[in-house]
Amino acid sequence: MATRNRTTVYRKHRDACKSARAPLSLSASDSFGGPVIEMVSGSFSRSNHSSYAPLNSYDPGPSSSDAFTIGMPPAWVDDSEEITFNIQKVRDKMNELAKAHSKALMPTFGDNKGIHREVEMLTHEITDLLRKSEKRLQMLSTRGPSEESNLRKNVQRSLATDLQNLSMELRRKQSTYLKRLQQQKEGQDEVDLEFNVNGKMSRLDEEDELGGMGFDEHQTIKLKEGQHVSAEREREIQQVLGSVNDLAQIMKDLSALVIDQGTIVDRIDYNVQNVSTSVEEGYKQLQKAERTQREGAMVKCATILLVLCLIMIVLLILKNILF
């Protein structure tokens, strides 16, 4: 059963209620005269199809007509949490699918239809979770205020990368499973062909012809079971091919977001390089300005005046000494 952790939301509401002053007295006449503490239900109320009723509390202070609002997280946060939860479920089911693949590929003498049905069911559930997460991911960029668009896009790209990695891993597992199924089918066909060459067995003979060739009832049943297993393998191969095609479409949709993320990273690198070039150019201009300031006319005039002042001081000293 799917569960969601609401401990953080509960603690937020509890702390907000504690911050309000406790009512000193409450009567029937003034029970609705105090401020209204509005518990604004955001995405949490949408997920549980319920809303909070206003809580009335009496405040004897001067701000008896004030009201404050306790905000909930935006709707897109719930979408991201649901996608994260689906990603974890996909990882768990992929582990179960790997075990089911191992059981289905083991040679058995009995009926293994239950294992094949389990593989089919797990593959269908994983594909549905990936499709559902992909739709939620596409809605993520359109929900919420425009001020949070950059944050939503970063979360969207991060989740898209995780979904694409899971899709690639599932596709790789399905391809490996399909290859081993085909190898088993080819091995069985080679055995049937060998029997045909030796004149001992024919897959296309009718039951009467088999009896005429000297096969007893037990051998005829075994032959029919082998044909049934071969048809079952063929059906599984077609099913795996279908799931691989579905995964290819999902990966195609997710690749746009991942490519967008790579484009932004390249753009950041380009901007960093431009900033580095601009800083170097600015440093050169600063050095040039410093040299210009040192070699300017004002500096030359000040130097000449200083030299003249020194000369005049020397002449004044000599005048006093000589005369």
From Swiss-Prot:
It comes from the Eukaryota. The keyword Transmembrane applies. Residues 1-302 are cytoplasmic. GO terms for molecular function: SNAP receptor activity. It is a single-pass type IV membrane protein. One of its GO terms (biological process) is vacuolar transport. SMART domains: SynN, t_SNARE. Disruption phenotype: Gametophytic lethal in homozygote plants. Slightly shorter roots. The double mutant syp41 syp42 have short roots. The double mutant syp42 syp43 exhibits severe pleiotropic defects, including short roots, a large number of lateral roots, semi dwarfism and early senescence; these phenotypes are associated with defective secretory and vacuolar transport pathways. Keywords: Golgi apparatus, Membrane, Plant defense, Protein transport, Transmembrane, Transmembrane helix, Transport. Expressed at low levels in roots, stems, flowers and leaves. GO terms for cellular component: membrane; trans-Golgi network. InterPro entries: SNARE, Syntaxin, Syntaxin/epimorphin_CS, Syntaxin_N, T_SNARE_dom. The chain crosses the membrane at residues 303-323. The keyword Membrane applies. It is found in: Golgi apparatus, trans-Golgi network membrane. Residues 227-289 form the t-SNARE coiled-coil homology domain. Interacts with VTI12 and SYP61 to form a t-SNARE complex and with VPS45. Belongs to the syntaxin family. PANTHER family: SYNTAXIN, SYNTAXIN-42. Contributes to the regulation of secretory and vacuolar transport pathways in the post-Golgi network, and to the maintenance of the Golgi apparatus and trans-Golgi network (TGN) morphologies. Vesicle trafficking protein that functions in the secretory pathway and mediates liposome fusion. Required for extracellular resistance responses to a fungal pathogen. Also involved in the protection of chloroplasts from salicylic acid-dependent biotic stress. This is Syntaxin-42. It comes from Arabidopsis thaliana. The gene is SYP42.
